[in-house]
């Protein structure tokens, strides 16, 4: 389960996220909808620690994290357990589709290349 409590983010006097609360259970698939500029991307960037949060609590895998004071080691550990699809995706143009799919498994998850290729091929067969 993933739970976020009172997530806050401001840029100077502009309060973008004002105490966001959400709970996502294992197996849930969710969509975040809203007009342009409503904070959807900022919310996801804060959840993936691509941008610092001003305040809030994250509960993931029965562990509680203070989003304002989270440590780099905690961030690295959480990133190994989560995924993030960017609004504007970026591919390595000099690599094949399979190489793009397996890159994260090999680099971030330290998976051996053979296993990553097997998983990558299965994923590509689905699209």
Per-region residue spans from a language model:
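Conserved ABC ATPase "signature" region
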Residues: 62-66, 109, 113-127
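Short coil-to-helix segment of the ABC ATPase nucleotide-binding domain corresponding to the Q-loop/switch region
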Residues: 94-104
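Short coil-to-beta microelement around the adenine-binding A-loop and adjacent beta1/P-loop entry
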Residues: 14-15, 76
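Helix-to-loop junction immediately C-terminal to a conserved catalytic motif
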Residues: 48
């Amino acid at each position: 389960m993933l739970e976020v409590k009172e997530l806050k983010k401001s840029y100077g006097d502009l309060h973008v996220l004002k105490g966001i609360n959400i709970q996502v259970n294992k197996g849930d698939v969710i969509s975040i909808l809203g007009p342009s500029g409503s904070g959807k991307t900022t919310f996801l960037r804060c959840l993936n620690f691509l941008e610092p949060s001003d305040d809030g609590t994250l509960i993931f895998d029965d562990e509680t994290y203070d989003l304002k004071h989270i440590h780099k080691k905690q961030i690295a550990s959480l990133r190994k357990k989560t995924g993030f699809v960017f609004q504007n995706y970026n591919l390595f143009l000099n690599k094949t589709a399979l190489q793009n799919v397996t890159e994260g498994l090999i680099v971030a998850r330290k998976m051996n290349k053979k296993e990553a290729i097997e998983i990558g091929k299965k994923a590509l067969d689905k699209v």
